[in-house]
Amino acid sequence: MSFTKIAALLAVAAASTQLVSAEVGQYEIVEFDAILADVKANLEQYMSLAMNNPDFTLPSGVLDVYQHMTTATDDSYTSYFTEMDFAQITTAMVQVPWYSSRLEPEIIAALQSAGISITSLGQTVSESGSESATASSDASSASESSSAASSSASESSSAASSSASESSSAASSSASESSSAASSSASEAAKSSSSAKSSGSSAASSAASSASSKASSAASSSAKASSSAEKSTNSSSSATSKNAGAAMDMGFFSAGVGAAIAGAAAMLL
């Protein structure tokens, strides 16, 4: 079975130069030609590896292609190459101990001899250039995006500055109008206060004059009342004096009558 694996690998590698499928590129053809050359030159090593290392397996599809190839009468079997995963075949070859030291340099040399510029297996210069172009395009897009963002930020800043200036101007105008209105209101309030003071002063003066007049009238009335009281007192004193005199006269009269009566009584006795 191990020999069958090697035979299949050799057969597929040998048939790779006859690939007619458009889906299989020159890169794969040159790579398998290099593998075939190494297998032929070191057949015993490959057979020993296949017999002693059970982990060394061929990718699916290789044996099927081998069977079609051994039974076909023409190159129609090459149409089955599209069913194989060439990347898996390369992975299988990477498992050999001498891949890095011997097989990889041979494959790179074969690719370069075929006119394929390559820096490492799996990537060509053209692919690298394509990636560089893509990176350059991405960088250009990033630069344009950055420029657009910067322009947008500048416009936003300008708009914000203009809006702030207009708002400041409107606020200043509103404050000035408010201040003027406040000054006018204060002036009118001062006039009203002055008028109120004047009116209050006149009213107070009139009230004081009225109070003074009333006080003067009250004083006159008081003087009259005092004079009347004095007259009443004098009259009372005079009446008292007269009454006292009359009482005294009545006393003397009563005493005289009593004495006369007493004297008459004595004479009768």
Curated annotation (Swiss-Prot):
Gene Ontology molecular function: structural constituent of cell wall
- This protein's record includes keyword Glycoprotein: yes
> What's the superkingdom here?
Eukaryota
Query: Cellular location of this protein?
Result: Secreted, Cell wall; Membrane
Specify whether Thylakoid is a keyword of the entry.
no
List the carbohydrate attachment sites: N234
**Lipid-anchored residues (GPI-anchor amidated glycine):** G245
GO-annotated biological processes: fungal-type cell wall organization
What Pfam families does the record point to?
A: SRP1_TIP1
Q: How is it modified after translation?
A: Extensively O-glycosylated. The GPI-anchor is attached to the protein in the endoplasmic reticulum and serves to target the protein to the cell surface. There, the glucosamine-inositol phospholipid moiety is cleaved off and the GPI-modified mannoprotein is covalently attached via its lipidless GPI glycan remnant to the 1,6-beta-glucan of the outer cell wall layer.
Classification via InterPro entries: SRP1_TIP1 (IPR000992), Yeast_SRP1/TIP1_CWP (IPR050788)
Physiological role: Component of the cell wall. Required for anaerobic growth.
Q: What is this protein called?
A: Cell wall protein TIR3
**Source organism of this protein record:** Saccharomyces cerevisiae (strain ATCC 204508 / S288c) (Baker's yeast)
Task: Please name the gene that encodes this protein.
Answer: TIR3
